[in-house]
Design a protein with these regions (language model features):
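Histidine-acidic metal/acid-base catalytic patches
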Residues: 1-6, 21, 26, 32-34, ...
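N-terminal pre-domain/capping segments
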Residues: 1-88, 110-120, 140, 148, ...
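Generic enzyme active-site microenvironment
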Residues: 12, 40, 162-164, 193-194, ...
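Active-site loop/turn elements of alpha/beta-hydrolase fold enzymes
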Residues: 17, 43, 95-96, 166, ...
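Positions that flank functional sites
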Residues: 20, 46, 98, 169, ...
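Short acidic/His/Gly/Ser-rich catalytic and metal-binding motifs that mark active-site loops
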Residues: 47-54, 100-103, 235
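Short, basic/glycine-rich phosphate-binding loops at helix/coil junctions
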Residues: 56, 121-127, 227-232
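Active-site acidic/histidine proton-transfer and metal-coordination neighborhood
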Residues: 61-191
Length: 289
C-alpha cells in the first residue's frame, strides 16, 4: 500500500482510521525502510478490536456515558502510541456529537427542493444553533475531560492533536465551538485541521463562508493540517481535485508552508484522477510560492 503511494510520487502519507492490526507489521517495515514518511494518523488507528468496520466515530468523547468516554480515550491513547512508532507529528481527531440529529439530511433535502433559504429551513437552523449554545457546557465538559486525559500522552510523544472541521452540523465542534477549543488548547498541544470538502459542504448549506473561516484560522496561526478533496453541492465530497466547485486557486495561497497536506480522495477515485489531483494541487502551490 505505502509502496504504491510512493510510486505515485508522494513523499508522505496519512494512516487512516481504516488501518487494521494485520497491516501494522508491513507499515512499520515500510516506514523503517524509508519508503515514505507518515505525515499524520487519523483516530482511531488501528481499527479497535471488536469494531466490525472502520469508523472514526465508533467511540465519542461527547458520549454521555462515562465508561464509553473512557473507551474512546483508551483507543485514542493506542492511536497516539502507534503514531509515535511511525514518527507521525500529528493525530487527527473527531471530537464528538453535538446535535441536533438529522439536521444535515433535512437541509440537504431542502437544498435539492430549492428551499434552503425558505423560512422553514431558516427556523430549523436557528433552533439548531440555540440548542447547541444551550447544550455546549455539558457537551464541552465531556469532550474536555477526554482531551485533558490525552494531552500529556501526546505531549510526551511530541505529537499535536488536530481538531477536524466536520461536514455535519450535528457533530462537534461547530465554528464557534472551535474558537473555544483553540483558546483552551494552545498551538504547542493542538491545532485546527481543515477539511476542504467538509468546509464546502457546510458552506453549501449556508452555515459559514468557507474562505473566511479558512483565512481566519490561518491568520490565527492555528492551521495544523488539511485534508484535500473537491466537493460538489450539496454533499458530493472526496472527489478528485478539479471535479467539484471548491476555489482552490483562491485558498491554496493562504496555506503556510509548515501545514500538513493530505490528499483524501474517495476509494472510487481512480489512479489517473489521483495523479491529476496531485498535479493540479501542486500547480496551485507552485503559483502561491
Amino acid at each position: 500500500m505505502l509502496m504504491e503511494i510512493a510510486e505515485l510520487g508522494f513523499l508522505a502519507a496519512e494512516l487512516s482510521h481504516g488501518v487494521r492490526y494485520s497491516l501494522i507489521p508491513g507499515i512499520l517495515k515500510a516506514v523503517e525502510g524509508g519508503v515514505l514518511r507518515i505525515s499524520s494518523v487519523h483516530n482511531f488507528c488501528p481499527v479497535p478490536l471488536g469494531v466490525s468496520r472502520p469508523s472514526p466515530n465508533c467511540y465519542l468523547f461527547s458520549d454521555p456515558h462515562p465508561e464509553m468516554r473512557r473507551v474512546a480515550v483508551r483507543h485514542t491513547l493506542e492511536t497516539l502510541e502507534f503514531a509515535a512508532r511511525v514518527h507521525a507529528p500529528a493525530v487527527v481527531l473527531h471530537l464528538g456529537h453535538g446535535g441536533p440529529d438529522g439536521i444535515t439530511p433535512r437541509l440537504e433535502r431542502a437544498y435539492h427542493a430549492g428551499k434552503l433559504y425558505a423560512r422553514s429551513s431558516t427556523r430549523l437552523k436557528v433552533a439548531a444553533v440555540a440548542q447547541r449554545r444551550r447544550d455546549f457546557p455539558q457537551i464541552y465538559g465531556r469532550v474536555r475531560e477526554c482531551l485533558d486525559a490525552l494531552v500529556p500522552a501526546a505531549t510526551q510523544r511530541g505529537i499535536r492533536l488536530g481538531f477536524e472541521i466536520r461536514e455535519d452540523y450535528a457533530e462537534f465542534p461547530d465554528e464557534i465551538e472551535m474558537d473555544r477549543l483553540l483558546d483552551d488548547y494552545g498551538p504547542a498541544v493542538a491545532g485546527y485541521w481543515h477539511d476542504f470538502g467538509h468546509a464546502a459542504r457546510k458552506e453549501f448549506l449556508g452555515w459559514h463562508d468557507h474562505a473566511a473561516t479558512f483565512a481566519r484560522r490561518v491568520a490565527q496561526g492555528r492551521l495544523l493540517g488539511c485534508h484535500i478533496h473537491d466537493c460538489s453541492p450539496p454533499d458530493h465530497d472526496h472527489r478528485a481535485v478539479g471535479d467539484g466547485e471548491i476555489d482552490f486557486a483562491r485558498l491554496v495561497p493562504l496555506i503556510p508552508p509548515e501545514a500538513i497536506r493530505v490528499l483524501e480522495l474517495s476509494p472510487r477515485v481512480g489512479r489517473d484522477d489521483v495523479i491529476k489531483s496531485k498535479a493540479i494541487w501542486s500547480s496551485f502551490a507552485a503559483t502561491s510560492a
